[in-house]
């Protein structure tokens, strides 16, 4: 519970992209990302290593890879526009970076939705120190 309180305090000042990604996931899955995905398995949240533990963790791995390809962008900082139409996420205009970041986030949100059935509560708050296998290539 203390961790949730700390995260809430830290996120009060968060604006832009990371908050947008949170909203996108919440709209797609109906789940609160801060408690559902932030500390999930080996790749969800900051950093990642080892072999993804399941399909949900693989969504995070692929998302990290997607961000990794955007070398000229600031995926965690750039603000983009998107809307939801008939349950579809539609990335809006903006710069090429903003569009690409939005598409990475959209793919992750859809992946989480498609893999809700694989979500394993045992991987929530999983210690990254247990992720010791060699990481797959993107």
Curated annotation (Swiss-Prot):
Organism: Protobothrops jerdonii
Keywords: Calcium, Disulfide bond, Hemostasis impairing toxin, Hydrolase, Lipid degradation, Lipid metabolism, Metal-binding, Platelet aggregation inhibiting toxin, Secreted, Signal, Toxin
Protein name, UniProt field: Acidic phospholipase A2 jerdoxin
Residues at the active site: 63, 105
Cofactor(s) needed for function: Ca(2+)
Listed CDD domains: PLA2c
Enzyme class: hydrolase
Source domain of life: Eukaryota
Intracellular or extracellular location(s): Secreted
InterPro entries associated with the record: PLipase_A2, PLipase_A2_Asp_AS, PLipase_A2_dom, PLipase_A2_dom_sf, PLipase_A2_His_AS
């Amino acid at each position: 519970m203390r961790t949730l309180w700390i995260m809430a305090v830290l996120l009060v000042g968060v604006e832009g992209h990371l908050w947008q990604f949170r909203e996108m996931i919440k709209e797609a899955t109906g789940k609160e990302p801060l408690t559902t995905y932030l500390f999930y398995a080996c790749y969800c949240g900051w950093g990642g290593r080892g072999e993804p533990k399941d399909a949900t963790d693989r969504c995070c791995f692929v998302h990290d890879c997607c961000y990794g390809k955007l070398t000229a962008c600031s995926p965690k900082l750039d603000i983009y526009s998107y809307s939801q139409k008939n349950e579809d996420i539609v990335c809006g205009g903006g710069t090429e970076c903003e569009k690409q970041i939005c598409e990475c986030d959209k793919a992750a949100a859809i992946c989480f939705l498609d893999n809700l059935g694989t979500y394993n509560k045992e991987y929530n708050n999983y210690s990254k120190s247990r992720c010791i296998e060699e990481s797959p290539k993107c």
